[in-house]
């Protein structure tokens, strides 16, 4: 795969990665999840692939609820037997990709933009997307006193989580569709893009330093709880209202060395999604309980309930939409047209799905040949 002159945000990644790396420095690349009760090894269980542990990364977001629920309900641990689940929580994609590249994690739940970036920067050698997890859960929430219609967004200050992340690309693309000009790197133009960590965004909104935000759940619902109004649900911009927000990646080195362990994690993911979709209220509570275990703070009902309703949990990686998101990044000037052929390896996922009697999924022409 050829080297791209301008890989996804080569300038921005170093900057936006700095904050999460600082906050996680005490724990390496990701903070460790305190999930002792949910990672207990059953008596008589055997190790998979001779591994002592499998290191799993994810974000403390509801869009990563497959991982949250899988850990909280002990589903990952059940499938891995005596191989211990070792969870790590991240705040941003670049730090999770760095952790995957260094071997600090083996498998991760992550958004499409950092997946693309990690693959492109490594010339297609670092990772594979091996499954889907979630669709939706992204909204443009605004101050209704300042913004009453979509056209009012022009001239305002809108937050996105970080330069070049999935929501940043989506907002820049939407702004371009309105014929507004914005410098992608600086965020300045007909609308000002303010890159703000999701943890800080609600306070920035309350202080008036931003007029709205294009953000994932639960941040979007936190803003609504502060008086914000949902002006646009990103799902409305996509065919069938479906687009990838979270997929599953694995280190290519780990995939080659330990396919049985990867298959076990994928089986657990499929089981978790099945349980989530069959038991939405219980699943919502389980995800919130894991968020509390990881961060020390659970979400309030007025945030949790609306946030949960806007997310769809699926094993389908929605590969065609990832390709479209890459095209949006190219359009925004954040990425030269990449060669994503081979970014997916859905072999093990489809093996699991067939065994479970479920429909297989495809890579939209971007799979391993």
Which stretches of residues belong to each language-model region?
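Bacterial N-terminal signal peptides that target proteins for export
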Residues: 1-16
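C-terminal motif of bacterial Sec signal peptides marking the signal peptidase cleavage site
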Residues: 22-26
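Bacterial signal peptide processing site
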Residues: 28-31
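Short, glycine-/small- and polar/acidic-enriched structural segments
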Residues: 36-194, 211-214
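Short, solvent-exposed loop/beta-turn-alpha elements that line the ligand-binding surface or hinge
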Residues: 77-82, 183-186, 236-240, 308-318
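Pocket-lining segment of extracytoplasmic ligand-binding domains
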Residues: 187-190, 199-289
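Secondary-structure end/capping motifs
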Residues: 256-336
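Conserved C-terminal helix/tail region of periplasmic/extracytoplasmic solute-binding proteins
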Residues: 327-369
């Amino acid at each position: 795969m050829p080297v791209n002159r301008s890989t996804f945000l080569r300038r921005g990644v170093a900057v936006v990665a700095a904050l999460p790396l600082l906050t996680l420095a005490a724990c390496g690349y990701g903070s460790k999840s305190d999930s002792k009760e949910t990672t207990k090894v059953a008596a008589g269980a055997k190790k998979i692939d001779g591994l002592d542990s499998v290191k799993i990364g994810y974000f403390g977001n509801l869009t990563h609820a497959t991982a949250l629920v899988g850990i909280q309900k002990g589903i990952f641990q059940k499938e891995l037997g005596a191989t211990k689940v070792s969870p790590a929580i991240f705040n941003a994609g670049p730090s999770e990709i760095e952790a995957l590249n260094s071997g600090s994690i083996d498998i991760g739940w992550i958004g499409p933009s950092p997946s693309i970036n990690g693959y492109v920067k490594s010339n297609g050698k670092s990772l594979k997307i091996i499954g889907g997890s979630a669709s939706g859960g992204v909204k443009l929430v605004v101050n209704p006193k300042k913004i009453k219609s979509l056209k009012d967004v022009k001239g305002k200050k809108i937050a996105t989580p970080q330069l070049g992340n999935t929501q940043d690309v989506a907002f820049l693309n939407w702004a371009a569709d309105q014929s507004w000009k914005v410098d992608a790197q600086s965020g300045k133009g007909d609308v000002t893009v303010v890159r703000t960590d999701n943890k800080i965004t609600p306070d920035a909104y309350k202080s008036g330093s931003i007029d709205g935000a294009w953000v994932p759940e639960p941040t979007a619902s936190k803003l609504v709880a502060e008086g914000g109004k949902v002006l646009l649900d990103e799902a409305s911009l996509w065919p069938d209202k479906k687009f990838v927000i979270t997929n599953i990646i694995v280190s290519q080195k780990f995939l080659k060395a330990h396919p049985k362990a990867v298959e076990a994690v994928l089986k657990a993911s499929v089981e978790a999604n099945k349980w989530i979709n069959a038991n939405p209220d219980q699943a919502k509570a389980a995800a919130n309980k894991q968020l509390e275990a990881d961060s020390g703070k659970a979400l309030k009902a007025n945030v949790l309930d609306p946030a949960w309703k806007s997310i769809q949990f699926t094993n389908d990686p929605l590969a065609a939409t990832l390709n479209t998101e890459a095209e949006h990044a190219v359009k925004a000037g954040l990425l030269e047209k990449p060669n994503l052929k081979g970014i997916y390896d859905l072999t093990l996922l489809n093996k699991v799905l067939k065994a479970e009697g479920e429909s297989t999924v495809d890579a939209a022409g971007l799979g391993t040949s």
